[in-house]
């Protein structure tokens, strides 16, 4: 969709009435790019000691990681005594850390590193600061701390302080506000990392209090947690910016649980989504040293550069092909560059193609394939490469042209008095594309040109009025990236532009329902753009509509709602996703596993996040001339963990 795809990426459809407040950020100069470093937890859990910590910190320097930006070295849980000192101060476990924290801070600072400490908003075990925030902040500063990771264990009084509570009785912002205020009173700047596992949608309030916030539950030593984490990141990518970074959790690279391609995918996506890059493996201790392949991944300068890019804009999800097992993310970089990632969710290696219009581009003068180590020049419309099972095609694109624009010098070739433009892209098969032809200079007198799309189409004669430098016409195109447009002309052409049809929107209110599916009215300004939705779609409950169209493949944008956040389920099957299927004229359904859309608290926000719409596009084949029966549901949902589909707001068919 030349001009449409650049706009329909995966956007929260609260676009008409954004109920999110302005997100203030700390103005202390810290974390202008995402923080990088190393943390004890993923490998050593709550059992770190001084020897382990010093050895790994030294490895940051010895392995060249510190020079690349990995400078925060953090001791996570397990460093405190169970009781405070007589004056109320926290102290370290002298058995595990005999030199003491001030000496450890000095050691790190002498290495050119920064000292990270760990605390907790609760009452016990993790280094609790509840009702001791100012005292603890002053203590951390006196020890020479440079950052504080602040957890939320044992904090829910109404339930007797369980270790973890995913549905607290009150909002979490006030609890973190106390420590944030205490840190801001210090003379020493301390990076504040909010870690309450994504509960209460911290993206709305954490940027005003800290420099990063955990978007979800812990990453686990299982490949499926990467998909789960990315699905939770989708509605939060636009919250990222200098001084405020969504934290996808510490890296598993080097822990021996992911394959090399999986580690490359994990590292690539954490980097381009602007997550803090915190190593969670053993770099070097008395018995363990990180393997060379994982170290190579952690030291990949281009990928680190995308994470630390001065523009500070996160990549976002652009397209997902659930049935085919791959998806595309992309985002802008400084100096007009673009980064794109094509993830292969299947377990086998295969060739995958990136259609550049899916990321808002039509061509690139230079494409770097980072993990393949290759470079291509003058790439037009699409790029194909081999991708390992569970691997990622990570690309940097330079010298790009926006989607829908076809300069003659790139796409055109002369043929007599004509010009042939190749590799013209169309998201849908449609008769309603708009072609704009740009001439090198103003046409002095009336003339005519002819346009032919493909080899077998009838030629179209277009009158060119005098004193014009551009003329437009409506043309047919076939879905795909191999359309050709031949223009016979007597005046020089510089470029053509192709704009997709606007499409027709069909709100869910126009669909009839079966089974338990029901229409629900949402709060004012929500469930955009309709104001209502269909919920409880399942294998036996559907929404059915009749949509007129021409024959062929169509690009369809679906407005959906999903806020089934995986908290306790994240340790097992939870994926932060729900399915939607579209069946056309009784044919095989197209399945789309949609990520979260909620942009408000799942506990206290309007509609508990179930009124926040997002949009995702899918190609649907099998349209016929005339009326088409469209069924939205969750075919085969009974076979998995998702019996209910995402809620359905409406869809737009581009024809």
UniProtKB/Swiss-Prot annotation:
One of its GO terms (molecular function) is alpha-galactosidase activity. InterPro entries: Aldolase_TIM (IPR013785), Glyco_hydro_27 (IPR002241), Glyco_hydro_b (IPR013780), Glycoside_hydrolase_SF (IPR017853), Melibiase_C (IPR041233). It is found in: Secreted. Keywords: Carbohydrate metabolism, Disulfide bond, Glycoprotein, Glycosidase, Hydrolase, Polysaccharide degradation, Secreted, Signal. Pfam families: Melibiase_2 (PF16499), Melibiase_C (PF17801). The active site is at 151 (nucleophile), 218 (proton donor). One of its GO terms (biological process) is polysaccharide catabolic process. It catalyses: Hydrolysis of terminal, non-reducing alpha-D-galactose residues in alpha-D-galactosides, including galactose oligosaccharides, galactomannans and galactolipids. The keyword GTP-binding does not apply. Its EC number is 3.2.1.22. Belongs to the glycosyl hydrolase 27 family. Hydrolyzes a variety of simple alpha-D-galactoside as well as more complex molecules such as oligosaccharides and polysaccharides. This is Probable alpha-galactosidase D. It comes from Aspergillus terreus (strain NIH 2624 / FGSC A1156).
């Amino acid at each position: 969709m030349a001009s449409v795809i650049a706009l329909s990426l995966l956007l929260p459809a609260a676009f008409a009435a954004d109920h999110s407040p302005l997100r203030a950020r700390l103005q202390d100069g810290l974390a202008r790019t995402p923080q990088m470093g190393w943390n004890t937890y993923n490998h050593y859990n709550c059992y770190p000691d001084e020897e382990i910590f010093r050895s790994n910190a030294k490895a940051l320097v010895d392995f060249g990681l510190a020079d690349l930006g990995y400078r925060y070295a953090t001791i996570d849980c397990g460093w405190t005594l169970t009781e405070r000192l007589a004056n109320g101060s926290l102290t370290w476990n002298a058995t595990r850390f005999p030199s003491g924290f001030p000496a450890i801070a000095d050691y790190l600072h002498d290495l050119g590193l920064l000292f990270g400490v760990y605390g907790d908003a609760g009452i016990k075990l993790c280094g609790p600061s509840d009702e001791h925030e100012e005292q603890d902040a002053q203590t951390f500063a006196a020890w020479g701390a440079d950052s504080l990771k602040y957890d939320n264990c044992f904090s829910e009084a109404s339930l007797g302080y369980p270790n973890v509570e995913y549905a607290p009785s009150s909002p979490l912002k006030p609890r973190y506000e106390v420590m944030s205020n205490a840190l801001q009173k210090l003379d020493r700047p301390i990076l504040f990392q909010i870690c309450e596992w994504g509960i209460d949608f911290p993206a709305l309030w954490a940027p005003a209090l800290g420099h990063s916030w955990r978007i979800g539950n812990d990453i686990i030593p299982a490949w499926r947690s990467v998909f789960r984490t990315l699905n939770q990141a989708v509605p939060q990518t636009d919250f990222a910016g200098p001084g405020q970074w969504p934290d996808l959790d510490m890296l598993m690279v080097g822990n021996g649980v992911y394959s090399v391609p999986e580690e490359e995918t994990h590292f690539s996506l954490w980097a381009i989504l602007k997550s803090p890059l915190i190593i969670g493996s053993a770099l070097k201790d008395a018995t363990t040293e990180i393997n060379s392949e994982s170290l190579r991944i952690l030291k990949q300068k281009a990928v680190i550069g995308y994470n630390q890019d001065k523009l500070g804009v996160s990549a976002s999800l652009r397209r997902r092909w659930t049935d085919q097992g791959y998806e595309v993310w992309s985002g802008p970089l400084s100096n007009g560059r673009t980064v794109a990632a094509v993830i292969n969710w299947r377990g086998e290696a295969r060739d995958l193609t990136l259609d550049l219009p899916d990321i808002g581009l039509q061509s690139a003068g230079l494409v770097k394939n980072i993990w393949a180590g290759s470079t291509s020049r003058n790439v037009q419309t699409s790029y194909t490469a081999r991708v390992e099972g569970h691997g990622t095609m990570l690309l940097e694109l330079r010298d790009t042209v926006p989607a829908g624009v076809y300069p003659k010098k790139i796409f055109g070739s002369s043929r007599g008095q004509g010009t042939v433009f190749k590799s013209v892209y169309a998201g849908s098969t449609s008769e309603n594309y708009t072609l704009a032809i740009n001439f090198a200079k103003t046409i002095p007198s009336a003339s005519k040109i002819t346009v032919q799309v493909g080899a077998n189409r009838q030629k179209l004669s277009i009158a060119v009025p005098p004193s014009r430098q551009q003329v437009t016409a409506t043309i047919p195109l076939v879905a795909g990236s191999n359309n050709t447009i031949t223009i016979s002309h007597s005046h020089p052409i510089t470029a053509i532009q192709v704009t997709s049809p606007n499409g027709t929107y069909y709100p869910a209110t126009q669909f009839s329902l079966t089974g338990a599916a029901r229409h629900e009215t949402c709060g004012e300004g929500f469930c955009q753009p309709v104001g209502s939705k269909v919920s409880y779609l399942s294998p036996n409950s559907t929404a059915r509509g009749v949509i007129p169209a021409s024959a062929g493949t169509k690009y369809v944008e679906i407005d959906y709602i999903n806020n089934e956040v995986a908290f306790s389920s994240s340790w097992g099957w939870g994926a932060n996703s729900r399915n939607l299927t579209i069946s056309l004229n009784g044919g095989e359904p197209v399945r789309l596993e949609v990520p979260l859309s909620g942009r408000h608290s799942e506990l206290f926000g309007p509609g508990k996040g179930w009124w926040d719409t997002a949009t995702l596009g899918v190609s649907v084949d099998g349209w016929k001339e005339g009326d088409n029966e469209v069924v939205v549901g969750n075919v085969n949902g009974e076979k998995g963990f998702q019996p209910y589909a995402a809620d359905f707001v409406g869809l737009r068919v581009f024809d």
